[in-house]
Design a protein with these regions (language model features):
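Acidic, Ser/Pro/Thr-rich low-complexity regulatory regions
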Residues: 1-175
Length: 175
C-alpha cells in the first residue's frame, strides 16, 4: 500500500467521523462516499473502494426498495473491510501505518542487519499493541545509524500526527 492509499483511507475515515458526530444518516454517508470517490483525486486501495461502494449502494438502489444500512451495519462494513473502528480509529490507523511501514522497510532493507534487528525489536512491541513506541524505536535506530530509507517508504508515516515521530521523520529525510 502506498502513502497515497493510506492517506485516502485516513481522510475518508476522518470525513465519516464528522458525519457520525452529527448523528448517523445513511443518506449523508452515501452522498459523502459518492463525492469522496469522485473528488479524492488519489489512489485508493481496493478495500476502501469496496467500503465506498457498499456505503453508497443504497443511494443508487433506494428506488428499487433497497433498505439503507443501519449505523451498526455501516460500522461493521468499515471494520471488516478496512480493519478500522469508526468510533475510535486512532489505534487502528497507527497500526495500519506502522505495519505497512515495517512491511515495506523489511522488503526493501532486510539485508541490512541493523534494520533487521530494529524490525525484530519492533515486532515484540507490536505484540503488546505498542505501535507508537515501535515506530519511534525504528526511526530512532535508523537515524542513529544514518540509514537511508527510500522516500516512498518514509512517506508512509506522513499521516502520523505525533510531533516526535514528525521530527524523526524530518531528520531521516536528510540522511
Amino acid at each position: 500500500m502506498t502513502s497515497e492509499e493510506i492517506k485516502a483511507i485516513v481522510y475518508y475515515i476522518q470525513g465519516l467521523q464528522v458525519l457520525w458526530k452529527e448523528g448517523y444518516n445513511a443518506e449523508k454517508v452515501a452522498l459523502y462516499s459518492y463525492q469522496f470517490n469522485l473528488r479524492a483525486g488519489m489512489d485508493m486501495p481496493d478495500e476502501l473502494l469496496d467500503v465506498i461502494e457498499m456505503l453508497e449502494m443504497w443511494d443508487d438502489n433506494w428506488i428499487y426498495g433497497a433498505v439503507p444500512l443501519t449505523e451498526k451495519e455501516a460500522a461493521a462494513v468499515i471494520q471488516e473491510e478496512l480493519n478500522i473502528d469508526i468510533y475510535h480509529p486512532e489505534k487502528d490507523i497507527i497500526a495500519l501505518v506502522t505495519n505497512e511501514f515495517i512491511s515495506q522497510l523489511k522488503n526493501e532493507c532486510s539485508s541490512n542487519r541493523i534494520v533487521a534487528k530494529a524490525l525484530e525489536n519492533a515486532q515484540e512491541l507490536i505484540i503488546y499493541d505498542e505501535y507508537f513506541v515501535a515506530l519511534q524505536n525504528i526511526l530512532s535506530e535508523l537515524l542513529t545509524h544514518h540509514i537511508h530509507i527510500p522516500a516512498d517508504i518514509l512517506s508512509i508515516i506522513d499521516i502520523i500526527e505525533d510531533s516526535y515521530i514528525k521530527r524523526l521523520q524530518a531528520s531521516l529525510w536528510g540522511v
